[in-house]
C-alpha cells in the first residue's frame, strides 16, 4: 500500500511492537500526527518534509532522521551479505538461462526451418526477445520470490523533475560514452582487434527496422532491466543502507552490458535510476527514463543516421572511390547528423551542470533505515560467493569481446 513499509522495514519500539518514530524521535501510536501533520499507521516511517530534488528532506536541513528510542543494536552484516549474495547469484542464473536458450534458439530454428533463416531480421531480434525477455525474465522473477522484500514509501515525481532527470541522463551518457570509448580504443589497440559487441551492435542498429528497435531496445529492455537491477535488487537490500544498494545496483547494471563502450554510462544511469526509485518508490519513473534514453540513442539517433545513409557508408568501407563519391552526394544529410550530435552535446552539457549544481547544493541525500550497516556494508555486498560468480561471468564477457574463443 502507498506509504507503507512491509516485512523487515518496520521500526520497533522499546517493547518490540511495530511503532513509528518521527524526525524528533517520538514514538507515535497509530492515529497520531507527527510534526508535519501526517497521520501515521503502524509500520510506517514518517518522511522528512523539506522539499528536495526527489522525495523530501529533513526539516533540519539535510540531516538524517534521528531514532532516540532505545533500539536493540545488532550486527546486520551477516543477513546483509546473504541478501546480496542471493540476488547476485540469481541474476547470474538469469544470464545462464538466457545464454542456454539463445544457444538452443540459434541451433534449433535453423535445423527446423533451414539455414537461410539466420538472414531474416526477425530471427536476429528474436534471439533477444524470446530467450531473454519471454523465457529467462519470467523464470528470474519466479526464482527471485518475495523473501526479504520491503515496500518503499511512494512519492510522486512531477514533470519538471522528470525533465531535469532526463537532462542528467544526457550528461551521464555523454561523459560515460567518452570514457568508455577511450578505454575501448586503448584496449582494442593493445589487443590489435576491435570490440566484437560494439561492431555487432553498430551493424545491427544501422541495418535494422525501426519496429524491432522500438519494441526491443525502446520498450522491452527498459522494463526487464529496471525490474531486475532496480526493483528486485533494491527491494531486498535497501533496508541495510541506501548508498550500498544504489551503488551495487548501478555498477552491476553497467558491468552486465559486458563491454567498455556501454559499461560506464550504463553504470552512471543505473546509479541515478536506483536513487530515483528509492526516493519515489515507483519503478515506472526509472522505466520511463530508461525508455527515453534508449529511444533517443537507439531509435531517433539511429533513424537519423539511416536517413543520412550511414548504413551505406559502412558497407562501402572497402571501396574508397565509391565512398568518396557517395560522401559528396549525401553531404547535406551529414550536416544534419552533425547538427543532431551538436544538440545532444548541448543537452549533455546541461545535464552535467545540473548534476554538479545538485551535488553542490546537497540535493541528493540518503536516509538511514533501522537496519543500516554503518561499517562493512560494501564489503558485505561485494565479498561473497554470489558476487564472485557474477564477476567471473563478467570477466568472461569482457575478455570475449577482444579474444576470439574457438570452442
Label each residue range with its predicted role:
Residues 95-103, 164-181, 286-303, 341-346:
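Hydrophobic alpha-helical membrane-insertion segments
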Residues 72-96, 121, 147-179, 334-335, ...:
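Interfacial transmembrane-helix boundary/kink motif in multi-pass membrane proteins
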Residues 98-111, 176-181, 395-404:
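Alpha-helical transmembrane segments of multi-pass membrane proteins
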Residues 208-407:
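Transmembrane helix-loop-helix hairpins at the membrane interface
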Residues 114-116, 121-170, 174, 185, ...:
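Membrane-helix interface linkers and caps
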Residues 1-82, 369-373:
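Low-complexity, intrinsically disordered extramembrane tails and loops of integral membrane proteins
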Residues 70-129, 192-195, 207-244, 306-308, ...:
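Transmembrane alpha-helical insertion/packing segments
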Residues 118-123, 154-221, 235, 399-407:
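Juxtamembrane helix-loop-helix connectors linking adjacent transmembrane helices
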Amino acid at each position: 500500500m502507498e506509504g507503507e513499509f512491509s516485512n523487515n522495514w518496520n521500526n520497533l519500539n522499546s517493547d518490540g511492537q511495530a511503532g513509528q518514530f518521527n524526525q524528533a524521535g517520538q514514538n507515535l501510536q497509530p492515529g497520531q500526527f507527527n510534526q508535519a501533520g501526517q497521520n501515521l499507521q503502524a509500520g510506517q516511517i514518517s518522511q522528512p518534509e523539506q522539499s528536495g530534488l526527489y522525495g523530501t528532506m529533513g526539516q533540519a536541513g539535510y540531516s538524517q532522521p534521528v531514532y532516540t528510542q532505545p533500539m536493540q543494536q545488532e550486527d546486520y552484516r551477516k543477513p546483509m551479505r546473504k541478501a546480496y549474495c542471493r540476488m547476485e547469484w540469481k541474476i547470474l542464473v538469469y544470464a545462464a538461462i538466457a545464454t542456454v536458450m539463445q544457444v538452443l534458439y540459434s541451433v534449433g530454428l535453423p535445423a527446423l526451418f533451414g539455414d537461410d533463416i539466420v538472414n531474416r531480421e526477425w530471427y536476429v531480434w528474436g534471439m533477444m526477445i524470446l530467450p531473454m525477455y519471454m523465457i529467462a525474465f519470467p523464470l528470474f522473477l519466479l526464482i527471485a520470490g518475495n523473501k526479504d522484500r520491503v515496500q518503499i514509501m511512494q512519492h510522486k515525481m512531477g514533470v519538471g523533475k522528470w525533465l531535469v532527470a532526463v537532462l542528467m541522463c544526457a550528461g551521464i551518457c555523454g561523459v560515460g560514452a567518452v570514457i568508455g570509448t577511450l578505454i575501448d580504443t586503448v584496449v582494442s589497440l593493445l589487443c590489435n582487434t576491435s570490440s566484437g559487441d560494439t561492431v555487432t551492435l553498430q551493424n545491427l542498429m544501422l541495418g535494422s527496422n525501426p519496429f524491432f528497435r522500438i519494441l526491443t531496445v525502446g520498450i522491452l529492455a527498459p522494463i526487464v532491466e529496471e525490474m531486475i537491477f532496480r526493483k528486485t535488487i533494491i527491494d531486498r537490500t535497501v533496508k541495510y543502507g541506501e548508498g550500498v544498494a544504489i551503488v551495487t545496483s548501478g555498477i552491476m547494471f553497467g558491468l552486465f552490458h559486458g563491454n567498455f563502450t556501454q559499461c560506464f554510462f550504463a553504470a552512471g544511469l543505473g546509479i541515478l535510476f536506483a536513487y530515483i526509485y528509492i526516493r519515489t518508490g515507483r519503478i515506472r519513473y526509472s522505466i520511463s527514463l530508461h525508455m527515453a534514453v534508449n529511444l533517443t540513442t537507439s531509435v531517433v539517433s539511429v533513424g537519423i543516421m539511416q536517413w543520412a545513409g550511414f548504413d551505406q557508408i559502412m558497407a562501402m568501407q572497402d571501396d574508397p572511390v565509391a565512398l568518396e563519391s557517395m560522401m559528396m552526394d549525401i553531404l547535406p544529410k551529414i550536416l544534419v547528423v552533425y547538427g543532431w550530435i551538436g544538440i545532444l552535446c548541448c543537452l549533455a552539457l546541461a545535464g552535467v551542470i545540473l548534476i554538479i549544481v545538485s551535488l553542490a547544493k546537497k540535493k541528493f541525500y540518503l536516509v538511514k533505515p533501522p537496519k543500516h550497516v554503518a561499517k562493512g556494508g560494501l564489503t558485505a555486498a561485494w565479498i561473497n560467493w554470489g558476487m564472485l560468480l557474477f564477476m567471473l561471468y563478467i570477466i568472461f564477457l569482457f575478455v570475449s569481446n577482444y579474444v576470439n574463443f574457438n570452442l
